[in-house]
Amino acid sequence: MDSLKKFKTTKLTSQDLNDFKIKLHAKYIEMLEANNNFFKFKEAEKQGKISKEELVEYKNKSIKAKKAFKAICQDKSFSENLKNITKIYNSTTRKNSSVILEQAKEELIEAKNLKREARDSVKDHGRGAQLTKLDKVAIKVENLKFKYAPDFPYALNDVSFEINDGEYVAVIGHNGSGKSTLSKMLIGVLSAQEGHVSIYGNVVTQDNLDQARKFLGIVFQNPDNQFIGSSVEADIAFGLENKRVNPKEMQKIIYDSAKKVGMENFLDKEPLNLSGGQKQRVAIASALALNPDILIFDEATSMLDPKGNREIKEIMVELRDKMKKTIISITHDMDEILNADKVIVMNGGRMVKIGKPEEVLKEKEFLRSIKLEIPFLSLVEEALGNEGIKVKHSQNMDELVKQLCK
């Protein structure tokens, strides 16, 4: 049947439904923010802090946002999609083959399901939207530029790179190099003024930011700022509750996440009474509970003592090797780059080097010129080489000692 063939080329799909949910959720958030701003500035106008004209401006923004949300809620595309296939199905007679009849029936069922889900998503404000993995490039940064103010220098200037799924990448640089700004870009705290960030092939926009963040887990420098519960268990549970995880599954998820970082026996302990390394383990467990594909460590070892520092670095390697997570570590700790698959060197807002650790460490004079210390292990390997003792690149001192013993 020609009409059925034509329908198959123009019909709406589950991807269209997901795109609808993303737009719906984005418009809902915009409406809430505009409405909250209006009521906040309404009070400010009463106190004489802003003029009536300014208040009218906020009121108009609120009205506009409500209309935009209402318009997308009244979208008829899924109803039209069902209407079209219903006509085709009803016009299909017994003269057609059983194959054609079955195909038309399948299309009708799919269209009904799409319409029902679209209707339900309106009630749920599009919260069920998800992004799918379109490729195996975990993070792709293209021509990224950012200034904190028009007359400021670029904090990021034409930065481009790719991080593949399952890679451990260290982003290194001194203070002011641009690595912290890059970190904020990756997690969506800042928006690019030029260029863009893609996660698994999805260009990140304000509309799909919430969905893109589901791929990410973040571990910050100071875990104390993340703790809100009276126990380790409560802190891990907090993130799950926010993501509307089934309560029946929550206990197992909490235990499994804690066990992955060796904290399963500390679930009843108060986080603030733990050591620095243990606190970071709790922060990692909280991130792992949501099962992200990508874990971003933002100066996660900089406030730890040597023991805690070493423990967290070992966990980061395990996350890559055993759990197949993509690891991005924003750091100024040059020793950490020895564990990485790839190193990105930032300076003056630009990416000045990218490559394997051993490739980057060959440029010792350049690294020193941009105020980066050479890892002690690398200096030892260099000294051995100068004495005619050739060794392979080692990730830690234990590996180097084993090579020397052989």
From Swiss-Prot:
Protein keywords: ATP-binding, Cell membrane, Membrane, Nucleotide-binding, Translocase, Transport
Signal peptide from the UniProt entry: none
GO cellular component, one term: ATP-binding cassette (ABC) transporter complex
Gene3D superfamilies from the UniProt entry: P-loop containing nucleotide triphosphate hydrolases
Superkingdom per UniProt: Bacteria
ABC transporter domain sequence ranges: 139-373
Main localization category: membrane
UniProt topology in membrane: Peripheral membrane protein
E.C. designation(s): 7.-.-.-
InterPro entries tied to this protein: AAA+_ATPase (IPR003593), ABC_transporter-like_ATP-bd (IPR003439), ABC_transporter-like_CS (IPR017871), ABC_transpr_CbiO/EcfA_su (IPR015856), ECF_ABC_transporter_ATP-bd (IPR050095), EcfA_1 (IPR030947), P-loop_NTPase (IPR027417)
Record has Chloroplast as a keyword: no
Pfam family name, one: ABC_tran
Residue stretches spanning the membrane: none
PANTHER family: ENERGY-COUPLING FACTOR TRANSPORTER ATP-BINDING PROTEIN ECFA1, HEAVY METAL TRANSPORTER
Its biological purpose: ATP-binding (A) component of a common energy-coupling factor (ECF) ABC-transporter complex. Unlike classic ABC transporters this ECF transporter provides the energy necessary to transport a number of different substrates.
Homology family: Belongs to the ABC transporter superfamily. Energy-coupling factor EcfA family.
UniProt-recorded name of the protein: Energy-coupling factor transporter ATP-binding protein EcfA1
Taxonomic source organism: Mesoplasma florum (strain ATCC 33453 / NBRC 100688 / NCTC 11704 / L1) (Acholeplasma florum)
Gene expressing this chain: ecfA1
